[in-house]
Amino acid sequence: MKEPKLKTVYVCSNCGETSPRWMGRCPSCGSWNTMNEDVVAEAPKAGLSGSKAAAPARQEGVTSLTARRLADISTTEEKSRILTGISELDRVLGGGIVLGGVVLLSGEPGVGKSTMLLQLCGAISNQHSVLYITGEESVRQVKLRAARLKVPQENIYLAAENDVDEICGLIEKEKPELVVIDSIQTMRCMDLSSSAGTVSQVKESAARLLAVAKKQEIPMFIVGHVNKDGAIAGPKVMEHIVDTVHYFEGDKMLPYRILRAAKNRYGSTNELGMFDMTGQGLEEIENPSQMLLEGRPLGVSGNCVACTMEGSRPILSEIQALATKTNFPAPRRACSGYDYNRMNLLIAVLEKRAGYFFGNLDVYINIVGGIALRDTACDLAVCLCMVSSLLDCPVSDKLIAIGEVGLGGEVRSVPNLEQRLREAERIGFERAVVPKHSLAHLNPADYPGMKLIGAAYISDAIHALKSDRL
């Protein structure tokens, strides 16, 4: 049989668009510097002598494919999910690992992806068999890491392999109850001439692994590397075909890690899991609010506590603001962990509706602990931080502010206010500034240790704080 000819093409790592020549910008998605060189086999020409003519004609009504009635398919939770025993991971997964589900776990190098998955294997290996495929380490290296983490090793099977077809054959032979692939960028389909990590290899490897996971109904975790922009390296189609995409985030200079879901077909994408990186591996942080507020400076202006909702979990976070005289023709505005445009909007509201001017001041906003706040319920706390820094008037360490601020200066209601207040009371806060019209829906008896202060407008909240000499 005549071997197919090879040709060089350039493939966009973002959308998969191909081009016979290199271009700085992808003509399909418009991304810059995403066209990567790849080697593919030329497709045979269509026609009388091409593949279409050589393919046998399909007989009408003849197929080996069967369909199952929807009512006959079991959907009970105890049969369709596996609990990992790691509550933070189960929370982000939506209640455990779904049978046949494929999870793509991505993160910066050294953030702890392999550590988490090895601990996951140990957590479920008491009741389920696990197959761990490593393409980056030897089995001895994984063994040393498992010993350091004190992972149960009896029911975990290791294999160091890069050939995807060999891995699929091993999965079909052993039929494990969980498979871990570390990582997809090291996998290779031997019938493709390109090297491992290229767009075609990553795309085809992911498709073949997904096919065997669905066919055997085996849950699978796949590790994916990130590029210099923080996005998952490889074609975007890989994120589309998997069931769940998780990002493992964290500053390597800080001990804790955050697990987020960017996509989840079987649960919410708003949930968040927090872990502490220790010498014995990752440990769950069951009380993130208390951890994030540890070491909070007291009696310092520009600090206030807000409560954000991450899925069904309320988390208290410290917001810091600094307003200082500028040395530049145009004052600087900078944010860390907060939306820049939202900050400018709130500054405009404070100037127009409350009479506090920041036109000749540099303004900086920082969310302590590296948490990214996207919840508009933090608006009121951000405004109080900026005013506190402007007036050099500290906010009480026993006060929390919850509310969305509108363009008219009004303080609007927020969802899950009761849960936020209960969390604040549990941590020890004694006063809460909340939207005034939300007081009608709250029972003060439910919060015996907390005084609720209603504010209809941002000026009311600031006046209440100043009159209370905070």
Where do the protein language model's features map onto the residues?
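Conserved RecA-like ASCE P-loop NTPase motor core of nucleic-acid helicases/translocases
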Residues: 130-134
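Conserved Walker A/P-loop ATP-binding site and its immediately adjacent core
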Residues: 135-141
